[in-house]
Curated annotation (Swiss-Prot):
HAMAP family xref list: PSII_PsbN (MF_00293)
Transmembrane parts of this sequence: 7-27
Protein name: Protein PsbN
Thylakoid listed as a keyword: yes
Keyword Mitochondrion in record: no
């Protein structure tokens, strides 16, 4: 059986981290925690 190259392992690790951070960002922006976010334009009515 052929062993995987270190570059492939690093690439898959980086891809997993990027996808995890993207998923966390989408969850923060549109999930339940988004109710706590403030809109700065609503805070400064003229």
């Amino acid at each position: 059986m052929e062993t995987s190259s270190p570059a492939l392992s690093v690439a898959l690790g980086v891809m997993a981290v990027v996808l995890g951070l993207t998923g966390f960002g989408v969850y923060q922006a549109f999930g339940p925690p988004s109710k706590e976010l403030d809109d700065p334009f609503d805070d400064h009515e003229d």
